[in-house]
Amino acid sequence: MVLRYNSPRLNILELVLLYVGFFSIGSLNLLQKRKATSDPYRRKNRFGKEPIGIISWWILGIALTYVVDISNLVIYALRVPNWWPCKTTVVCLILFLLFWIIVLISCADSKALPKNADSILKAYRLSVLYVWAIDIVFETIFIVYSPHPNETFQGIVLADHVARLVLCVFATAIYLTYRRKRHTHDPLDFEERQLTEESNVNENAISQNPSTVQLGVSASTSNFGTLKSTSKKPSDKSWAEYFRSFSTLLPYLWPTKDYRLQFQIFICIVLLFLGRAVNILAPRQLGVLTEKLTKHSEKIPWSDVILFVIYRFLQGNMGVIGSLRSFLWVPVSQYAYRAISTKALRHVLNLSYDFHLNKRAGEVLTALTKGSSLNTFAEQVVFQIGPVLLDLGVAMVYFFIKFDIYFTLIVLIMTLCYCYVTVKITSWRTEARRKMVNSWRESYAVQNDAIMNFETVKNFDADDFENERYGHAVDIYLKQERKVLFSLNFLNIVQGGIFTFSLAIACLLSAYRVTFGFNTVGDFVILLTYMIQLQQPLNFFGTLYRSLQNSIIDTERLLEIFEEKPTVVEKPNAPDLKVTQGKVIFSHVSFAYDPRKPVLSDINFVAQPGKVIALVGESGGGKSTIMRILLRFFDVNSGSITIDDQDIRNVTLSSLRSSIGVVPQDSTLFNDTILYNIKYAKPSATNEEIYAAAKAAQIHDRILQFPDGYNSRVGERGLKLSGGEKQRVAVARAILKDPSIILLDEATSALDTNTERQIQAALNRLASGRTAIVIAHRLSTITNADLILCISNGRIVETGTHEELIKRDGGAYKKMWFQQAMGKTSAETH
């Protein structure tokens, strides 16, 4: 007889070899879907597509040798009475066959591995090549110590060993040849390197300047006003990359300073292991109870019945242990949700102005609501994936001890097949669900745009257009949803088929053993109960994997937002701005949103303390940009801005912005009361201070005319108030803030002439003793300014007082003055 069928020690070594192989393949699958390489100068595949075919055929050949081995054993066992090889041999053959089938499927899966020999050999170097080398040693030992075959059965076994040895040596030779050729070939030639560099430069230019991406014009409303994304697809990430991304947020999930919550987490983990123990004791107790009942004893086994009921009462997520764990986990989950949600909002608010200019509010808000999904992801990994793996592992060990290694093999193969099918189908479903989620976000964003711009929609009578646009987005979402639901039902059918087939084999084998006296009826009950009990974690694994994928998809956008970095950041240990006088100096300041189109060029001026500086000029000339860079929404490209000889880039953003009061051209208010909106400038202000600020802004009497007075709600973005009322509320906020520097961006542009005079007087009082920079559309409002800067195409073309500029013949300011004067005279005439 050949050595392998008489030597359990060699079979044990085979199991060790098999473990190395399975562990390596598992590591490979964990890291799959990574890019083949990020090196732009990587060598080309010198073998082309041929090594893929050679490797695949080699793996198939190895698998077929084990098929021949198993078939040979079965035929010999049927021919020879009362003969069967040792169990370890059967298990080794089946597991090795399963191993090489997994390798073959993974190699053939284009998504699991790159499609070139270079990447295949790199990816499998740690998993398959080690198995090749070890297998060569084992096969050599088997062949050397095998006796001379005396019959066909032994000859076939020996031939299989020789075939595997030849295939392993052949595969190793291919790899060594590949390695030698790889090191002798030259890198990419100069032209290829140059083209690669140019391509990388273009890609970097696009990524750094998103505005260079062209807008696509389409008749479809789904592309209305959208940019084509050039970012990396989330599906290109591996599981390791996903866990690495999530790990950056784990500190916010762990209650670092709350020891009571930490103790509750410890109790939850203890309950988790207690639940696993009960999962063993419950079916075992049912088997014991069945054994006693089948003995036809006149004594009722009360203790066994009560013990079984207790186990059932404790078992499962609906049992006492599961319910207690869920109850104790509630405050931990709420802590994590609050930490993630507040962290997300804080991060978005800390992002620079350019992010908020390019964002879609609906999409960002949707992403921020997914903080619970991130919390769910962490909870699933710790308290759901762990228990499932423990239950399956404990079941295999228990079956091996209680019954037979064949039952362990059944559970193992069932688990592998079930998990593999679940992962593959779910991976296919993931892309469909990702499209569904993205289409839902798009429909939500369209709906949000229509509601947020309600007045514009009504002004242009665009109700039908918006309904059609939203309906088109909903149709796309429903189409993707149908695909997701179909794939879900298909997955359920396949999972049910795998479990039912495995259960049938286990029941038949157990029935055989009970029939011939190897096991008792109680053992059959234990097996059947435990197998049915295993269906729950297996089914739950499918649901869990889908839920895990869903959580990942739902939080992808949130993680992308967390990965966004502000372009304007404080220097480490930056001091607070100390405003003593309020002197503002712009020194050779240049700035551009897009490097191809400068907005400001060599801006120089000094705003003396207590003086009013007026900025006038054509729209788009850069006036508002001056205010933005003074508030440091953007950093200047060159030059510097100082306040009292302190560069604003060297101080904290909070101290800078708290020293500046702003009255914007288009004031936006929170959907709250008037009192809240005015008090927003100074949360510690008393009602008397608020009333005084409102009186100074000429809005107090108007507020008192509202039904609810200061408690009147202003509506979304202040739509319940007129433009003049909103502007006066903004002025009241600036007055209440009492800043050292005032920025007025056409603050009276939305007011009538009478109110403008009143507000102008209030603004003059506000600016008294403070540095004020005013953007003026109506030149009549800045005639008393201490310095007027006339800006055109990002440059200061004229400076002076009103009297000085009005006397300059051909000057830009004089032209604007007379144009407005003539327009006003013409309007009064008509």
Swiss-Prot record:
GO molecular function: ABC-type phytochelatin transporter activity; ATP binding; ATP hydrolysis activity; ATPase-coupled transmembrane transporter activity
Residues of the ABC transmembrane type-1 domain: 265-550
First and last residue of the signal peptide: 1-27
UniProt membrane topology term: Multi-pass membrane protein
Keyword tags: ATP-binding, Cadmium resistance, Glycoprotein, Membrane, Nucleotide-binding, Signal, Transmembrane, Transmembrane helix, Transport, Vacuole
Any one biological process term the GO annotation gives: cellular detoxification of cadmium ion
Binding site for ATP: Y593, G617, E618, S619, G620, G621, G622, K623, S624, T625, I626, M627, R628
InterPro entries: AAA+_ATPase, ABC1_TM_dom, ABC1_TM_sf, ABC_transporter-like_ATP-bd, ABC_transporter-like_CS, P-loop_NTPase, Type_1_exporter
Glycosylation sites noted in the Swiss-Prot or TrEMBL record: N150, N350
Assigned GO CC terms: fungal-type vacuole; fungal-type vacuole membrane; vacuolar membrane
SMART domains: AAA
Transmembrane segments: 51-71, 88-108, 126-146, 156-176, 263-283, 304-324, 381-401, 403-423, 490-511
Coiled-coil regions listed: none
Functional note: Involved in metal tolerance. Probably involved in the transport of metal-bound phytochelatins. Compartmentalizes cadmium within vacuoles, thereby protecting cells from cadmium toxicity.
The protein's name in its UniProt record: Heavy metal tolerance protein
Organism: Schizosaccharomyces pombe (strain 972 / ATCC 24843)
